[in-house]
A protein has these predicted regions:
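Conserved catalytic motifs of ABC-family nucleotide-binding domains
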Residues: 85
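Helix N-cap at the start of a conserved alpha-helix in ABC-type nucleotide-binding domains
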Residues: 100-102
Length: 172
């Protein structure tokens, strides 16, 4: 078991984007970011501004988050996860409830972050959106890894789940 100081070190390196998003609807986007920045011990608006730029949002963010589109909410949630400049991102369903254009824009942002050296883990039911942007795909079933590949192959394709079942190739 990690000691509390080691655990804090690990946590400081991880950014988490929850599903559903952990944002306060009555607060503006900037107020949300300032609030969460304080929880990380970050003062001033510079890190908030950097997080906003990283997800390509309007820097003003004066409207209450409750008035944002789903795409903007997801970007805000990602900005929140980036506040402390983590090395690792854990993203839970980042494309849920967003239109295809917004999802593709987010994939582009994630690819830029990956290229900048961040390690990104995405949990999604829309893995096809990450085709060409992910280094590895891992499929899980009942908590077990059932497939790993360097490219996206739908589980119901000839090289997907059916092939695994017929050939007995499982990582269980």
């Amino acid at each position: 078991m990690l000691g509390s100081s080691k655990l804090r070190e690990v946590c400081d390196q991880v950014g988490y984007m929850a599903h559903p998003s952990l944002l306060y609807d009555e607060m503006s986007g900037m107020e949300n970011l300032r609030y969460f920045a304080k929880l990380y011990g970050i003062s001033g608006d510079e890190r908030c501004a950097q997080a906003i730029r990283a997800v390509a949002l309007d820097p003003a963010l004066t409207r209450p988050v409750g008035q944002y589109s789903q795409g903007m909410r997801q970007r805000m949630s990602l900005a929140r996860a980036l506040l402390h400049d983590p090395k690792i991102l854990l993203l839970d369903e980042p494309f849920s409830n967003v239109d295809v254009r917004s999802a593709r824009e987010m994939v582009g942002l994630l690819a830029k972050m990956r290229d900048a050296g961040k390690t990104i883990f995405v949990v999604t039911h829309q893995a096809g959106l990450l085709e060409g942007a992910a280094d590895e795909f891992v499929w899980m079933e009942a908590g077990l890894i059932v497939r790993r590949t360097g490219e996206f192959v739908p589980m119901d394709s000839p090289a997907g789940e059916g092939a695994r079942l017929h050939t007995g190739e499982a990582s269980r």
